[in-house]
Design a protein with these regions (language model features):
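Conserved short alpha-helical segments that host acidic/polar catalytic motifs at enzyme active sites
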Residues: 1-208
Length: 208
């Protein structure tokens, strides 16, 4: 891994972010989340664009009020930043994933439609200080799984990761893969809203 990080939100709208350039096991040794936290994002990054030496390039990424994580590659991020007249959150940033969260902020409540313009692969999640829900979205090329219990919802890139959560939490999870072209709105451990979009299926991802 090139970097690891987490973000959480507690009993107010503020999202707290921590990231570091270590392996995942070192993050687990240091991770501290208050008991008041109700939403948590965790990410392990193998970078493709946006060097990890530049800390804002690493996940979770903040753009304005939106903090998110992304698995995949966005090929037309520079083009869409220019087309929408959106500036990078920080001038040093070059990471492609930032575009997703810039669109989430600019098109709050209409993000699914904006995601149709992305060319690339995507499984993503974000928290928005302008709204109380967690947002999950899947484009093409990257898996996204959710596991639900009576009061909790977990998400991960693989079913195996949810199996680990199930084992260590002693919860019984109902696991299912999110369909491509889906946006899920999560609050209080429940899916409270859904939207859909048509991903651009022309993208061919090259192996790292």
């Amino acid at each position: 891994a090139d970097s690891v990080g987490f973000a959480y939100r507690g009993d107010n709208s503020k999202v707290t972010v921590h990231k570091q350039r270590t392996c995942a096991s070192e993050l687990l040794d240091r991770i501290e989340v208050p008991q008041t936290a109700t939403q948590l994002l965790v990410h392990v990054r193998d970078y493709t664009k946006g060097h990890p030496r530049v800390l804002p390039n690493n996940h979770p990424i903040r753009h304005g009020a939106v903090v998110g994580i992304h698995n995949g590659t966005i090929a037309n991020d520079d083009e869409l930043f220019a087309a929408h007249g959106i500036a990078r959150a920080e001038p040093c940033m070059t990471v492609d994933s930032e575009l997703i969260f810039a669109l989430a902020e600019q098109f709050r409540g209409r993000t699914a439609h904006a995601l149709e313009r992305l060319v690339g692969s995507m499984a993503t999640a974000w928290l928005d200080e302008g709204r109380e829900e967690l947002l999950l979205a899947r484009g093409m090329g990257r898996p996204l799984w959710i596991g639900t219990s009576t009061q909790e919802l977990f998400f991960a890139s693989t079913r195996a990761a949810l199996d680990v959560v199930e084992e260590y939490s002693s919860l019984k999870l109902r696991k299912r893969e999110v369909r491509e072209g889906s946006v899920l709105v999560v609050n209080g451990g429940r899916i409270v809203g859904r939207d859909s979009f048509r991903p651009d299926m022309s993208f061919e991802e090259r192996p790292l």
